[in-house]
Amino acid sequence: MNILELSEQEIVRRQSLQTLREMGIDPYPAAEFPTNAFSTDIKAEFKDEDEPRQIVIAGRMMGRRVMGKASFAELQDSKGRIQVYIARDEICPDENKDLYNTVFKKLLDIGDFIGVKGFVFRTQTGEISVHAKELCLLSKSLKPLPIVKYKDGVAYDKFDDPELRYRQRYVDLIVNDGVKETFLQRATVLRTLRSVLDNAGYTEVETPTLQSIAGGASARPFITHFNALDQDMYMRIATELYLKRLIVGGFEGVYEIGKNFRNEGMDRNHNPEFTCMELYVQYKDYNWMMAFTEKLLETICIAVNGKPEREIDGNIISFKAPYRRLPILDAIKEKTGFDCNGKTEEEIRAFCKEKGMDVDETMGKGKLIDELFGEFCEGTFLQPTFITDYPVEMSPLTKMHRSKPGLTERFELMVNGKELANAYSELNDPIDQEERFIDQMKLADKGDDEAMIIDQDFLRALQYGMPPTSGIGIGIDRLVMLMTGKTFIQEVLFFPQMKPEKKMPQSAIKEWEEIGVPEDWAYVLRKAGFNLISDIREEKAQGLQQKIGEINKKYKLGYEKPSVDDIQGWINAANA
């Protein structure tokens, strides 16, 4: 990287880096630095009457106040922040005071990692702090952090642009309070979920992410190519069909927590790569699964929040069992006045069009009902509500309802206006399943790119016999959103999918060279604000010479100054 591509602060930091090395200080030491305390523990366990506690801590320097022979630094470790008192003659007991006067005061920067050995004390202002006896550099930072400043209770220079926060999550975690806590709560959600399932006797398993058939859900898959087999493969859209194979194989209950991939849109509730938990238990039905799900979510909410409720968007959402249960067709009738019972595909499509919905001939009856529910019903269910008994056209992997012809034993759990879980009494009739797959292929022939493909191996597994089974899929990212009160899925993903980063248009160095500009001077031109060759077309040669000469002098580059005639040649070539 050319030095002129760096900011002023980055250049200064690299100069400090070089000076440290010249002083014999390794800015990136390899040796272990064992610590024995965290900032939060130091504060919580401090007692004025105790003997001073000897501690070794390490962390990122987030602030510094230099006051002659004594200074204060703010150190941030993985748990929190603590003040460090640094006295020149304490860390430099002999005649050489370079560690304090040069290294600490001049060469260290905000963002550097330091190690401190010393003891705990309380300052005259009452702040629990660490009195440094030894100090060392553990890692030099080369980019300046965006440091939030406060004045009269107002924050300035906040790092709060969502795109920057999501793209540079590592910076977000450093400078914004509460971000790390969200991801620690996510870990609590997963840990509690596993604990409940393990204690119930169910086995965590892993199934293929690369699949030859994208089955188990209605979604558009990502496609890749497996060179060794010269075969197209799919990133899985669900784990369902492989987990059911394991139920066929004799497991009582299996679950998987893993990534699924759907080649669809991105918004505040959807990411193309997402985490899902699927659970399948033999000899159970969807009624049992509703009761199990209620207790599971109540347990998770208590683990995260200390109580079975959470405030989201100003609404108190209660996860305390039991939840309301409402058939989907009743929900549509309740919200629209239209009764889908007994209606044909054409009648439902006509009603959708009457309501101004964007529907077409490729949509079958199930898809139309799904669109109706999404348009008029889904967003209205704030409290946890089981939407049950879906039409068979919407549920190709679900057992027919035991008492309601044309419907299936399926539920979706709605919370805060969004789907959180999807569950069935699983279809285990191999003949019925094959017929459902064939119906799905007919939808695909009509243009539905989310219709399921026939999975012949799954049908073969069913033919060996699968016991009565209930299964559920829970979107972990949405679950974490609910448990942490976040309204954007990007807030609970460390690194959400982003659009390509916008970059300032620049002419390539090679393009500058093609019009006669030497490589070194091409970087100087960029530093002077001429990013495109077209930017110099209206410049006067003498004025341009002065501008780039100032850059040459400021950064002590020592380049031989081009003549006015040389620069005029560049301008002429740019206008050619």
Describe these PLM feature segments.
Residues 1-504:
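Class II aminoacyl-tRNA synthetase catalytic cores and aaRS-like
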Residues 501-576:
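Compact, charge-rich alpha-helical regulatory domains located at protein termini
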